[in-house]
Swiss-Prot record:
Residues 912-976 form the SAM domain. This is Ephrin type-A receptor 3. Most abundant in the heart, brain and lung. PANTHER family: EPH RECEPTOR A5, EPHRIN TYPE-A RECEPTOR 3. It holds the Pfam family Ephrin_rec_like. ATP binds at residues 629-634, 654, 701-707, 751-752. Keywords: ATP-binding, Cell membrane, Glycoprotein, Kinase, Membrane, Nucleotide-binding, Phosphoprotein, Receptor, Repeat, Signal, Transferase, Transmembrane, Transmembrane helix, Tyrosine-protein kinase. A motif (PDZ-binding) lies at residues 982-984. It comes from Rattus norvegicus. One of its GO terms (cellular component) is GABA-ergic synapse. It catalyses: L-tyrosyl-[protein] + ATP = O-phospho-L-tyrosyl-[protein] + ADP + H(+).
C-alpha cells in the first residue's frame, strides 16, 4: 500500500505538468465517454475489489478528475479487471478508444522480476441494455494488449516526473445499442489517467455554396456519397456531391451551386446586389455597377432601368449602356445626272451612343406644287439598296425625267422603334433633267389624196420634258429605206404633199426635248389613195396571215420539188447523203463540234451578240449588298443571285454608269459577250446579264479573296512553294484554254487574276482586251494607244503585235509577281526605262527563295524571239511535272549561277548606299521595322550587316517576309563585295 500511495501522490503532481501540452479535440470527433468530464466518482466495476483503485487528481486547469490505478507487482498470477459503465452507441458504426496512462518500468522495482508486467489488456462487450453490476469475463472480446511507449523509473519518481502515454485503438463495426469497455491487469504498475471513447463524423460544412450535413461513415471499407443542398438564393449548376471518409474527412467535391441573378457570392452565402448594382444571370459573376443612363433602387436587381428618353434594344446585353435614337443626318448633297441622282450626307452629330446606325431613303414624287407628293414608283431603283444603308451615299436610278422629287433620309439605330419622338430625317428636293421622250405609240391617217396625206398622233406617254418638235421620217416602201425624207412638225399633226400617186409609204415619228430625240415609233404603212388602209393597227393581223400563207405555199413547193428530184435519182454532186452541212449566221462560219472564239465587235448590234452568248437575268432575282469598287464602266458591287428552283449564290455585279456613251455600252456588253463564250474552271464564270432594265448589269461568280496581287501582298511569305505553283498551274490552264479558242487576252497580270477561298485562280477582266485607255499601268506607244508595258512583250509594245506568244510573255511576269508575293514589276522604274531595259536584253531578277526551275520558266517566257517562247500547253506540262516531283522545287539558284543580264533586284538593297538604318529599311519596303531596330544594338548599318535570323527574332522581327528581305539584302552585299555590282 505504501507503493500505491507513492504512485498516487506522484501521479497527482505529474499530471499537471503533462496535461498542459494537450491539443484541443478535433471537430470531426464525437465523444461517447470522457472520464475527465465526469463530475464525482466514475463508479466503474473493479473485480476483484483489491485490484484497480479509483483515486482523485487535478488537470491542467486544477479541475478535479477521477482516475484508476493498480500496482500489485509483488504477487503472482494477477487478474484484475476494471469495467466501465454502459456506453450508448448513438449513430456510431466504428468507435475509437483513447487511453492516457502511466506505467512503471519493472526494472526499477526491486524483487519483482518474476511477477511484474509492463502491459495490460483492453476488452469490450456489446449489449442492447445496461447489465448493471453483473460482470462475466467470458462475454468480453479482447481488443488489444496495451504497452507503454515510455515507462517511468525510480529516478523519475525522485524528480517527480511521470511519462504519460497515449494509445488509441479502433473498434468496430458495432451494431448493438451500447457497449462496455474492460481493462485487465496481469501484474503491471499502471495508472489510467483518462479514458475517452468517441466516433468520427464528417461535420456540417459549406462547399461551393452547397451545404453538407453531419455524416457518420458507414464502415471502414467505402466512402459515403452525400448530396449537398444549395444555400439560400442559389441553384445547382451541377449536382453538388462530396464523399465522407472513414476518418471523418470530406473528400472529392463534385458539382457546385451558383448564386441566382441579383445575388453574388460572399463567403458561404449569396448576398443581394445593393442599389446601383445588378447581376443579370445566374452564375459566379459579381454584381456590376449599372451602365450609363440606367439605375436601380432596390436590392437584388437583375437589370437596371433606363433613364427617361433612353432605351435598351431587345438584343442589347444588360451590360450595355442605355441609348437613344440618333439625330438627323447632316449636309445632304445631291448630284443629278439625267434621270438618276447620287445622294451624299454626313453622319448625325449625335449617334445616340450606338454603332448600329443605318439609313433609310424615303422617295416622294411631287407635282409642281411641292405639297402634292406621292410615293415613288416601285420601278425606281436604289443602289446598293433603299433601306438599311450602312454608308452615307446612295444612287437612285430610273427616275422620271423633268420631275420633282423629295428624298427623306432617315437615321435609324437599334432603339429608334422604341422611342416616341418623331422621325429624325434630313430632306432634299431635286428636279431631274429632261431626257429623251418615249416613242410615239400610234400614227393615225386623217385624210389622203393622190399626192398628199395628213397624219396625227398623240404625245408620247412619257415626254420626259418639254416637247420641242417631232421628226417625221418617210420613204417609199419599195425603196426599203435606201432613200428617205425627214421633216419636222411643231404639233401632233402634219400634212405631207408632193407624194407619188397610188404609192405605199412607210412613216416613223419621234419626239425631241432639250435632251435630244427619243426612239422612233414603229413603222406605219399608208397608201396615198383614198382607199388606203394602215397595215399596222387593226388590219395588221390580216396582212400577217396573208404573208404567212404565201410563205407556206412557197416553202411547200420548194420541198416538193427537192423530194421529186431526189426520187428521180438526180444528184448535183457525188458527196454522201449524210455529209455535214455548214451553217452561216451573223457573218461567222460555224463548224459542228469545234468551239472557236467569236469577236463580238463584228456584230452590228452588241445586244445581239450578248444575247447569243450570255443568259438574260431578271433584275428581281439579284440583290445588291454593297459597292466594293469602281470599274471602267461603272460601279462594282457584291450581291446575291437567286434563280428559281436553284440555290442562292454570291455574285459580283458590274453596273453600267449613268450617262454612258454608245461606245461605252458596246464595250460593256462586249465584255459579257466575251466571257459568255468561255467555260473553264480557271476562267471567271459569267452568270448572266441584265439588259432589259436599268442599270445594265454583268453578273459573274464572286471571288472572295479578290485580286491575286493584293492577296499575295497581304499574305507575304505565308504559302509553300507547292501552293504557289498550284496557283500558277491554274492560271496557265486557263490561258491554255483561251489560246486553244484563239483568244488573245492582251492584259494578263496578277491584278487581273481573281482568287477564291479555295486558292483557285481564275483569269478575268476581258473588257480591257481591246482598249486600255483608263489603265494606270498603261503607257503611250508610237501608235497612239495605251498598253501596260510592264507586262507586255517587246513586239506588242513596239508594233502592237498581240498574239498568244505575247500572252506567254505576260504570264512570265505574272509568275514573277507570284513568286515575289505581289512585288511591282521593275519597281519604281519609269515606263520608258522599262521599255529600254527590256529591249537591251535585261530581265527581272530572281525572286527571293524562288526555285531554279520556276526562274528558268520565267526566262523562257521572256525570250525576245516569240517563236522560242513555250506554248501554254507546254507550261501546264512543266508545272504538272514540278508538282509531281516537289523535290525539284527545293533547288535554289545560287548567286554565282545567275545570268548576267539581270536588273538589280531591289529587294536586295546595298547597305553601303545608305547612311542610316532607316534609309536602308525604307529601300526594302520594310519601314515598319524601323521602330524595332531603334535603340537596340543593331542600330547602325555596320552592326546590322552581321545580324542573323535568330537575332532578328530576339529584337521582334518575327514575320517571315521582312526577315527574308533583310537577310537576302545582307547576302547580296557579300556577293557584290566579291563579284562586283550587277549590271542595270
Amino acid at each position: 500500500m505504501d507503493c500505491h500511495l507513492s504512485i498516487l501522490i506522484l501521479f497527482g503532481c505529474c499530471v499537471l505538468s503533462c496535461s498542459r501540452e494537450l491539443s484541443p479535440q478535433p471537430s470531426n470527433e464525437v465523444n461517447l465517454l470522457d472520464s475527465k468530464t465526469i463530475q464525482g466518482e466514475l463508479g466503474w466495476i473493479s473485480y476483484p475489489s483489491h485490484g484497480w483503485e479509483e483515486i482523485s487528481g487535478v488537470d491542467e486547469h486544477y479541475t478535479p478528475i477521477r482516475t484508476y490505478q493498480v500496482c500489485n507487482v509483488m504477487d503472482h498470477s494477477q487478474n484484475n479487471w476494471l469495467r466501465t459503465n454502459w456506453v450508448p452507441r448513438n449513430s456510431a458504426q466504428k468507435i475509437y478508444v483513447e487511453l492516457k496512462f502511466t506505467l512503471r518500468d519493472c526494472n526499477s522495482i526491486p524483487l519483482v522480476l518474476g511477477t511484474c508486467k509492463e502491459t495490460f489488456n483492453l476488452y469490450y462487450m456489446e449489449s442492447d441494455d445496461d447489465h448493471g453490476v453483473k460482470f462475466l469475463e467470458h462475454q468480453f472480446t479482447k481488443i488489444d494488449t496495451i504497452a507503454a511507449d515510455e515507462s517511468f523509473t525510480q529516478m523519475d519518481l525522485g524528480d517527480r516526473i511521470l511519462k504519460l502515454n497515449t494509445e488509441i485503438r479502433e473498434v468496430g463495426p458495432v451494431n448493438k445499442k451500447g457497449f462496455y469497455l474492460a481493462f485487465q491487469d496481469v501484474g503491471a504498475c499502471v495508472a489510467l489517467v483518462s479514458v475517452r471513447v468517441y466516433f468520427k463524423k464528417c461535420p456540417f460544412t459549406v462547399k461551393n455554396l452547397a451545404m453538407f450535413p453531419d455524416t457518420v461513415p458507414m464502415d471502414s471499407q467505402s466512402l459515403v456519397e452525400v448530396r449537398g443542398s444549395c444555400v439560400n438564393n442559389s441553384k445547382e449548376e451541377d449536382p453538388p456531391r462530396m464523399y465522407c471518409s472513414t476518418e471523418g474527412e470530406w473528400l472529392v467535391p463534385i458539382g457546385k451551386c451558383t448564386c441566382n441573378a441579383g445575388y453574388e457570392e460572399r463567403g458561404f452565402i449569396c448576398q443581394a446586389c445593393r442599389p446601383g448594382f445588378y447581376k443579370a444571370l445566374d452564375g459566379v459573376a459579381k454584381c456590376t455597377k449599372c451602365p450609363p443612363h440606367s439605375s436601380t433602387q432596390e436590392d437584388g436587381s437583375m437589370n437596371c432601368r433606363c433613364e427617361n428618353n433612353y432605351f435598351r434594344a431587345e438584343k442589347d446585353p444588360p451590360s450595355m449602356a442605355c441609348t437613344r435614337p440618333p439625330s438627323a443626318p447632316r449636309n445632304v448633297i445631291s448630284n443629278i445626272n439625267e434621270t438618276s441622282v447620287i445622294l451624299d450626307w454626313s453622319w448625325p452629330l449625335d449617334t445616340g451612343g450606338r454603332k448600329d446606325i443605318t439609313f433609310n431613303i424615303i422617295c416622294k414624287k411631287c407635282g409642281w406644287n411641292v405639297r402634292q407628293c406621292e410615293p415613288c414608283s416601285p420601278n425606281v431603283r436604289f443602289l446598293p439598296r433603299q433601306l438599311g444603308l450602312t454608308n452615307t451615299t446612295v444612287t437612285v436610278t430610273d427616275l422620271l425625267a423633268h420631275t420633282n422629287y423629295t428624298f427623306e433620309i432617315d437615321a435609324i439605330n437599334g432603339v429608334s422603334e422604341l422611342s416616341s419622338p418623331p422621325r429624325q430625317f434630313a430632306a432634299v428636293s431635286i428636279t431631274t433633267n429632261q431626257a429623251a421622250p418615249s416613242p410615239v405609240m400610234t400614227i393615225k391617217k386623217d385624210r389622203t389624196s393622190r399626192n398628199s396625206i395628213s397624219l396625227s398622233w398623240q404625245e408620247p406617254e412619257h415626254p420626259n420634258g418639254i416637247i420641242l418638235d417631232y421628226e417625221v421620217k418617210y420613204y417609199e416602201k419599195q425603196e426599203q429605206e435606201t432613200s428617205y425624207t425627214i421633216l419636222r412638225a411643231r404639233g401632233t399633226n402634219v400634212t405631207i404633199s408632193s407624194l407619188k400617186p397610188d404609192t405605199t409609204y412607210v412613216f416613223q415619228i419621234r419626239a425631241r426635248t432639250a435632251a435630244g430625240y427619243g426612239t422612233n415609233s414603229r413603222k406605219f404603212e399608208f397608201e396615198n389613195s383614198p382607199d388606203s388602209f394602215s397595215i399596222s393597227g387593226e388590219n395588221s393581223h390580216v396582212v400577217m396571215i396573208a404573208i404567212s400563207a404565201a410563205v407556206a405555199i412557197i416553202v411547200l413547193t420548194v420541198v416538193t420539188y427537192v423530194l421529186v428530184g431526189r426520187f428521180c435519182g438526180y444528184h448535183k454532186s457525188k458527196h454522201s447523203s449524210d455529209e455535214k452541212r455548214l451553217h452561216f449566221g451573223n457573218g461567222h462560219l460555224r463548224l459542228p463540234g469545234l468551239r472557236t472564239y467569236v469577236d463580238p465587235h463584228t456584230y452590228e448590234d452588241p445586244t445581239q451578240a450578248v444575247h447569243e452568248f450570255a443568259k438574260e437575268l431578271d433584275a428581281t432575282n439579284i440583290a445588291i449588298d454593297k459597292v466594293v469598287g469602281a470599274g471602267e464602266f461603272g460601279e462594282v458591287c457584291s450581291g446575291r443571285l437567286k434563280l428559281p428552283s436553284k440555290k442562292e449564290i454570291s455574285v459580283a455585279i458590274k453596273t453600267l454608269k449613268v450617262g454612258y456613251t454608245e461606245k461605252q455600252r458596246r464595250d460593256f456588253l462586249g465584255e459579257a459577250s466575251i466571257m459568255g463564250q468561255f467555260d473553264h474552271p480557271n476562267i471567271i464564270r459569267l452568270e448572266g446579264v441584265v439588259t432589259k432594265s436599268k442599270p445594265v448589269m454583268i453578273v459573274t461568280e464572286y471571288m472572295e479573296n479578290g485580286s491575286l496581287d493584293s492577296f499575295l501582298r497581304k499574305h507575304d511569305a505565308q504559302f509553300t512553294v507547292i501552293q504557289l505553283v498550284g496557283m500558277l498551274r491554274g492560271i496557265a490552264s486557263g490561258m491554255k484554254y483561251l489560246s486553244d479558242m484563239g483568244y488573245v487576252h492582251r492584259d494578263l497580270a496578277a491584278r487581273n487574276i481573281l482568287i477564291n477561298s479555295n486558292l483557285v485562280c481564275k483569269v478575268s477582266d476581258f473588257g480591257l482586251s481591246r482598249v486600255l485607255e483608263d489603265d494606270p499601268e498603261a503607257a503611250y506607244t508610237t501608235r497612239g494607244g495605251k498598253i501596260p508595258v510592264r507586262w507586255t512583250s517587246p513586239e506588242a509594245t513596239a508594233y502592237r503585235k498581240f498574239t498568244s506568244a505575247s500572252d506567254v510573255w505576260s504570264y512570265g511576269i505574272v509568275l514573277w509577281e507570284v513568286m515575289s508575293y505581289g512585288e511591282r514589276p521593275y519597281w519604281e522604274m519609269s515606263n520608258q526605262d522599262v521599255i529600254k531595259a527590256v529591249d537591251e536584253g535585261y530581265r527581272l531578277p530572281l525572286p527571293m527563295d524562288c526555285p531554279a526551275a520556276l526562274y528558268q520558266l520565267m526566262l523562257d517566257c521572256w525570250q525576245k524571239d516569240r517563236n522560242n517562247r513555250p506554248k501554254f500547253e507546254q507550261i501546264v506540262s512543266i508545272l504538272d511535272k514540278l508538282i509531281r516531283n516537289p523535290g525539284s522545287l527545293k533547288i535554289i539558284t545560287s548567286a554565282a549561277a545567275r545570268p548576267s543580264n539581270l536588273l538589280l533586284d531591289q529587294s536586295n538593297v546595298d547597305i553601303a548606299t545608305f547612311h542610316t538604318t532607316g534609309d536602308w529599311l525604307n529601300g526594302m519596303r520594310t519601314a515598319h521595322c524601323k521602330e524595332i531596330f531603334t535603340g537596340v544594338e543593331y542600330s547602325s548599318c555596320d552592326t546590322i550587316a552581321k545580324i542573323s535570323t535568330d537575332d532578328m527574332k530576339k529584337v521582334g522581327v518575327t514575320v517571315v517576309g521582312p526577315q527574308k528581305k533583310i537577310i537576302s539584302s545582307i547576302k547580296a552585299l557579300e556577293t557584290q563585295s566579291k563579284n562586283g555590282p550587277v549590271p542595270v
